[in-house]
Curated annotation (Swiss-Prot):
The keyword Ribonucleoprotein applies. Part of the 50S ribosomal subunit. Contacts protein L32. Signal peptide: none annotated. Residues 134-180 are annotated as: Disordered. Belongs to the bacterial ribosomal protein bL17 family. Keywords: Ribonucleoprotein, Ribosomal protein. This is Large ribosomal subunit protein bL17. InterPro entries: Ribosomal_bL17 (IPR000456), Ribosomal_bL17_CS (IPR047859), Ribosomal_bL17_sf (IPR036373). PROSITE patterns: RIBOSOMAL_L17. PANTHER family: LARGE RIBOSOMAL SUBUNIT PROTEIN BL17M, RIBOSOMAL PROTEIN L17. It comes from Mycobacterium tuberculosis (strain ATCC 25177 / H37Ra).
């Protein structure tokens, strides 16, 4: 059940705060990035991310839930047609807040909040590392049978190793798992 915000609100009453957040979210989805004060950006982030999560699901019920919050049908269409599918494989973290210099006049702390449009460098690097490790493992597995077939004739003539009951095969170092 939704609980009212305790303490100071953005600009006064709770209804005014809802209107501010709806307008900020509309501008964010329309333009991709907006410049606002830091407290407004911090309040907008979870609000906008919940709306994007609704858009990822894409059902009619989710569209109606978003239309309760955002009144602009064009922005809701953009949210469901473009923004939601773009973030389909991302679990949260759809927005980024970047602090900028304080506003002249009243020295209010300012920030830019924007939709994260690029893939993360670390996820691409991890994917490349996993692919390289899988290829190396496949290459090593393909090379192992040829080495064993070349080594078998030498082992058949070697009776000393076979007659010892406690003889152990040389241990191979464990295959390294790719780092995440």
């Amino acid at each position: 059940m939704p609980k009212p915000t305790k303490g100071p609100r953005l600009g006064g009453s709770s209804s005014h705060q809802k209107a501010i957040l709806a307008n900020l979210a509309t501008s964010l989805f329309e333009h991709g990035r907006i410049t606002t004060t830091e407290p407004k950006a911090r309040a907008l982030r979870p609000y906008a991310e919940k709306l994007i999560t609704h858009a990822k699901k894409g059902a009619l019920h989710n569209r109606r839930e978003v239309l309760k919050k955002l009144r602009d049908k064009d922005v809701v269409h953009t949210l469901f047609a473009e923004i939601g599918p773009f973030f389909a494989d991302r679990d949260g973290g759809y927005t980024r807040i970047i602090k900028i210099e304080a506003r002249k006049g009243d020295n209010a702390p300012m920030a830019v909040i924007e939709l994260v449009r690029e893939k993360t460098v670390t996820s691409e690097a991890n994917r490349a590392r996993r692919v390289a490790a899988a290829q190396a493992k496949a290459k090593k597995a393909a090379a192992m049978p040829t080495e064993e077939s070349e080594a078998k004739p030498a082992e058949e003539g070697d009776v000393v190793g076979a007659s010892e009951p406690d003889a152990k095969a040389p241990e191979e170092p464990p295959a390294e798992a790719p780092e995440n």
